[in-house]
Amino acid sequence: MEFRPFDVQLAVAFRGLTSRSGVLIKGVTRDGADAWGEYSPFPDYSPSQRNRWWHAAMEAAHGDWPAPVRDEVAVSSIVPDVPVNQVAELAAAGGCRTVKVKVGGYSSMLQDAHRVEAAAAALGPGGKVRVDANGSWDVDDAVRCLTELELAARRGGLDGLEYVEQPCRTIDELAQLRRRVDTPIAADESIRIPEDPMEVVRAGAADILVLKVAPLGGVHACMRIAEQTELPIVVSSALDTSVGLMAGIALARALPSLPYACGLGTGALFATDTVRTTLVPRDGVLRAQPWDVTV
């Protein structure tokens, strides 16, 4: 196997990050073809968290992925905490018809509402806006903020929000919130070990599960989780480079059902990448592409 360290720059600061670093692992499939995995856990991760990222990277480096049931994957664009005048371009990037707007961070509630409204207006009729609070609200704040953001989406010309991702930090808070709002709730940060999804389901804490390949230990680990629940799955990125995104695409292509656009459009956030041609959506979809690693 071959190991190549990388450090790539983001075009837009994302949750305080301006770059991503890690190691690419080059391996060989059973058929003798090259395969690549990405190991890029965040600096504050624990040894057990890092081990799952390592397992996912080694799985990818052996090309050990399930057979696909679809050729292409509908994805969402992403709007981080940026000024409202940058929202329209980011929201409509790559022809996406769904956008995820980051909320509850450094911006005020009013700024979040302006960005949601601008994103909705940029997509127009038939577009979908989801928001992601990364667990930044308590239950009462979430009720108040979601009321305002639902109104903002309607001012932008849509029927409301598609869903809210991880509005509160704990599973118990998500369950409480779900009983108080009509906005569908997707669990993301609450799902970081294979046992988490069933705890979310048992608590009645979510309508949708967000699965990320690297944090959960690989594509096959995610497939096993999906088999255990009847809740719809959204495959999302852990701010991977294009090499890591290929694992997300492999999962999304293999799932029997994929009713929502996946959160795999994050390649658009990178100024530099680990491949020659960054994986970004075209006409709102991603397709697997040949490896063209440049690091």
Where are these regions (language model features)?
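Residue-level detector of functional hotspots within protein domains
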Residues: 61, 87, 195, 229, ...
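Short linear motifs at secondary-structure transitions and domain/linker junctions
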Residues: 1-4, 51-55, 160-161, 184-185, ...
